Amino acid sequence: MEEKQERRRRIVLIPAPAQGHISPMMQLARALHLKGFSITVAQTKFNYLKPSKDLADFQFITIPESLPASDLKNLGPVWFLLKLNKECEFSFKECLGQLLLQKQLIPEEEIACVIYDEFMYFAEAAAKEFNLPKVIFSTENATAFACRSAMCKLYAKDGLAPLKEGCGREEELVPKLHPLRYKDLPTSAFAPVEASVEVFKSSCDKGTASAMIINTVRCLEISSLEWLQQELKIPIYPIGPLHMVSSAPPTSLLDENESCIDWLNKQKPSSVIYISLGSFTLLETKEVLEMASGLVSSNQHFLWVIRPGSILGSELTNEELLSMMEIPDRGYIVKWAPQKQVLAHSAVGAFWSHCGWNSTLESMGEGVPMICRPFTTDQKVNARYVECVWRVGVQVEGELKRGVVERAVKRLLVDEEGEEMKLRALSLKEKLKVSVLPGGSSHSSLDDLIKTL
């Protein structure tokens, strides 16, 4: 990464209050800071980031709002986003106005632009009022954005009927979105389709934005990126995988248990399946027990992340679960793990994931094949692409049974099919690595972005 340069100007960033959105936003912030820009992060009380020695060069400001702290949990992400955007539109204008007053006497502190998470679309109106350049940042991929846009158009023509009618129609392919089925569209598990579409209408509206940054790679999504360019008619900058472009301080909700690395050090190469279903996924007790039984039957080693409170209606501890499995030498269970370190470890041969975009990029960036068990929104799009387009994993659908778990694990860690996926995953890893090096597509895209700011 380049040395820090003389400060150019200041960029204001607005992350969405979710771990999967904060991490790439801070990676983007670090990349821009290393290119010479001063950074201001505008956030609500729902964000997890706090000023620290790792972020000493960043300015943090709080967008005042009066939503109860319980809203994020009680409303669910979709209804919460709708309410948060309405609440923050006026207060962010005041916030931005005060920031401009503070900086106007310092020429080098002039605000170059406002970069906002696509789901924090209230920022567009405020930046427009002060005639500041606006840039949308998508922490998800280009295909997911295309799906959200398509859903808005389909909804207007009652084209989402297969999602509502059931009777097997959800298995039908969506026109012009091959290989995606209606069931793969990024609907939310927390709200009806109508509410999701309401969010998508605003998040997919470029408004007066002058550009869009996406945490993706050209070699992964060339057709979706071309579609996006034609649809939005503004410059699109695919600069990912951002975790390979710049490091950022940890933004984990939970403390990472690094003892699992010591355990991995004792395992054979490519012998362990790493299981982590992200920071939101909730499981029924029955599903956890079926997974445990399937892992036992597979006769393979596993590192399993089970967050506190992620098993519905159960007080079963990780220690109790491992004891019930009666295979203490073959498994290790932690509350949270340093995922990048885990995926980079030579002992890890497969990743059972919810397929959040950050996790998917991190897995592909290390050449690790995936077992996909998506839960909500873009995870379903990502899982379908992992299996059918990039062909570096398999998707587990339907009811979770021990036999299904056992077969999926063996497919990746034991069968010849898994070896073929591993080779494709390693090839993809090299392509991603090249993309962020000088001359690579993402490196060049970042340079092009910098020239416009």
From Swiss-Prot:
Keywords: Glycosyltransferase, Transferase. It is an enzyme of class 2 (transferase). The gene is UGT76E9. Its EC number is 2.4.1.-. Pfam families: UDPGT. This is UDP-glycosyltransferase 76E9. GO terms for molecular function: UDP-glycosyltransferase activity. The lineage of its organism: Eukaryota, Viridiplantae, Streptophyta, Embryophyta, Tracheophyta. UDP-alpha-D-glucose binds at residues 279, 337-339, 354-362, 376-379. Belongs to the UDP-glycosyltransferase family. It comes from Arabidopsis thaliana. It comes from the Eukaryota. InterPro entries: UDP_glucos_trans.
